[in-house]
Amino acid sequence: MPPLNNMTTVIFPGSFDPFTIGHYDIVMRGLALFDQVIIGIGNNSSKQSTFPLEERLQAIQEAFAHEPRVKVEVYQGLTIDFAIEHHAQCILRGVRSVQDFEYERNIAEANKQLCGIET
């Protein structure tokens, strides 16, 4: 289902354990390209976290308290389902290395083929 308005939305998924300056920079770059950035904190109960989920959520919300175009949510399940739920046109990702790029490229191709969402 398309968005109800002409607003462009991107999701930025991750565990954000911890949320770093690099993550903050990616969100700010996303705001230059999209009307809204939804940060999705993935809740993977099988992974051991350094910081509790509630603490990560609160820290990220505080970091963007000045920016009404950023929303922060916790989600479970597939990232692509989270993107579809929010009518996102794109998934925002950061790449740190060649290995990251290869992994992200494969995921991006699957997202595009299965759901038509760019990464």
Regions found by a protein language model. Name each.
Residues 2-119:
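Nucleotidyltransferase catalytic core that binds NTPs
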